[in-house]
Amino acid sequence: MINIEFGPSTILGIAVVCGGILLYITRTIKPEISRDHDIFFSSVALLIGGILIFQGWRLDPILLFGQMLSTGTALCFIIESLKLRVPKENNKSLFSTQNKNNSNNRIIKFQPPSKYDINLNQRGKKEKKNNNFQLKENSKYTKDSLVPSNWNDINISSIDYEKPIDYQKK
């Protein structure tokens, strides 16, 4: 039995259907911000909107109020999500894949911004010059890795953790 009554549930159903259609249309208007899962959520919105239009007359007032609250919350999250999306071309990360021609392209190399490059003096402490940090090539650290070059020589089992650390030792 189909019984359509023009009431608050019909208006809510029409709003949900329009939201689903608009979510689907963003795929053709702005494909750079569309995602693959938008089609799924658009289909779910069309189904829910259709149910509210055709069967909304059966809702009690408190159930209709709950449906209005959940629909309003979902629409607010959809709008916020669309506003926060950035075009796929401009979405660049600090991480880049290393050696793309290599068969193991799952290795990730961190490329820090230039203002965070480090300049180390002979004692291994940071030096600040002109508010720019730069990494010396002849230091014991390299640009690709900030691990000491003699890391294999460190014997962790020989360290006595019960004695206090002597910071005055040279």
From Swiss-Prot:
Pfam family, one: Ycf66_N
This protein's record includes keyword Plastid: yes
Subcellular location: Plastid, Chloroplast
Top-level division of the source organism's lineage: Eukaryota
Keyword Plastid: yes
Main location: plastid
Cellular compartments per GO CC: chloroplast
Keywords: Chloroplast, Plastid
Membership in a protein family: Belongs to the ycf66 family.
Protein name, as recorded: Uncharacterized protein ycf66
Lineage: Eukaryota, Viridiplantae, Streptophyta, Mesostigmatophyceae, Mesostigmatales
